[in-house]
C-alpha cells in the first residue's frame, strides 16, 4: 500500500428538472480526501477549505470516517492504526451540490483502497446508496457524467451512465443559506396527481434525449416538472 493516497470526488446536481429522484450529473468541482501514513498517533481527521471549524473531526461521527469504517467492515479488514485523513472541501455544504454524497463516496473509495480493494464499483455504489438513502447523487459522484438510476425493492441499484459533451458548461445558483435535504423533502406532498406523473414521464424522455442527442433546444421542454419544483 502506498504511504499517501488521495481521492477526488466531484460535486453533483440531482433532481434535474423532470428527472426527480432519477437523474444526476457530475460537475467539475471537487473535494479531495487524502490519507498520509504516520508511525504513531492513531487515526486523526483534519478538515480544510469549506466547513473548516464546522464539520466534526471526530472520526466516528464524520461522514467520511463512517464511510471508511463501512468499507473496512465490508472488506473484512481493519483500517491502518495510524495516519492522518485530510478533507479538502470545495463543495459548499447543504447547497444542493451533493456535499454529503461526495463525503460518503470519498470515504468509501479511500477506505476501500486502504483495506485491500475488495469492493468493485457496483458494491461501492450499493454501500453509498444505503448510506445516502438514494443513488441520484451517489451515482454521478462515483461514475461521473449523466446518470439515470433506479433502486428496486431489494435495494439493488441499476445505473445507466452517459458521457456529456465536453463543450457544455453548467452554472449553479445556490441560496445564501443552508437547506438540508430532509427539510426540502418535507414540503413535498405524499401523493401526486396521475396527470402530473404522466407529464414528468414524457418530459424526462425529452430531457435525456436533449443531452444524448446534443439537442439542447429541447432542454427547456425537458426541464419542466410537476413533481417537485412547484413546491
Q: PLM features: what roles do these ranges have?
A:
Residues 1-95, 113-119:
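ATP-binding N-lobe of GHMP and related small-molecule kinases
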Residues 29, 97-120, 142-147:
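DPxDG-like acidic metal-binding loop motif
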Residues 43-47, 97, 161, 182-185:
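Short, charged, solvent-exposed linker or helix-capping segments at domain edges/interfaces
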Residues 63, 106, 203:
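Charged catalytic carboxylate motif
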Residues 95-101, 194-199:
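Short glycine/threonine-rich catalytic loop with a Thr-x-Gly-x-Asp
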Residues 119-231:
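ATP-dependent small-molecule kinase catalytic core of the GHMP/sugar-kinase superfamily
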Amino acid at each position: 500500500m502506498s504511504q499517501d493516497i488521495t481521492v477526488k470526488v466531484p460535486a453533483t446536481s440531482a433532481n434535474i428538472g423532470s428527472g426527480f429522484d432519477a437523474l444526476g450529473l457530475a460537475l467539475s468541482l471537487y473535494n479531495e480526501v487524502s490519507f498520509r501514513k504516520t508511525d504513531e498517533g492513531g487515526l486523526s481527521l483534519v478538515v480544510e477549505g469549506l466547513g473548516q471549524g464546522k464539520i466534526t473531526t471526530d472520526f466516528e461521527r464524520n461522514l467520511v470516517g463512517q464511510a471508511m469504517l463501512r468499507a473496512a467492515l465490508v472488506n473484512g479488514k481493519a483500517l491502518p492504526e495510524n495516519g492522518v485523513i485530510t478533507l479538502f472541501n470545495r463543495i459548499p455544504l447543504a447547497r444542493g451540490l451533493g456535499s454529503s454524497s461526495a463525503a460518503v463516496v470519498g470515504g468509501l473509495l479511500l477506505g476501500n483502497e486502504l483495506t485491500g480493494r475488495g469492493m468493485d464499483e457496483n458494491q461501492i455504489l450499493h454501500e453509498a446508496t444505503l448510506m445516502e438513502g438514494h443513488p441520484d447523487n451517489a451515482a454521478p459522484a462515483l461514475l461521473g457524467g449523466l446518470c439515470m438510476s433506479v433502486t428496486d425493492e431489494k435495494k439493488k441499484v441499476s445505473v445507466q451512465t452517459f458521457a456529456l459533451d465536453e463543450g457544455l458548461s453548467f452554472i449553479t445558483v445556490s441560496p445564501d443559506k443552508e437547506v438540508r435535504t430532509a427539510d426540502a423533502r418535507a414540503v413535498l406532498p405524499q401523493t401526486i396527481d396521475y396527470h402530473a406523473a404522466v407529464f414528468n414521464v414524457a418530459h424526462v424522455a425529452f430531457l435525456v434525449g436533449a443531452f444524448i442527442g446534443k439537442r439542447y433546444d429541447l432542454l427547456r421542454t425537458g426541464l419542466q416538472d410537476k413533481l417537485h419544483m412547484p413546491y
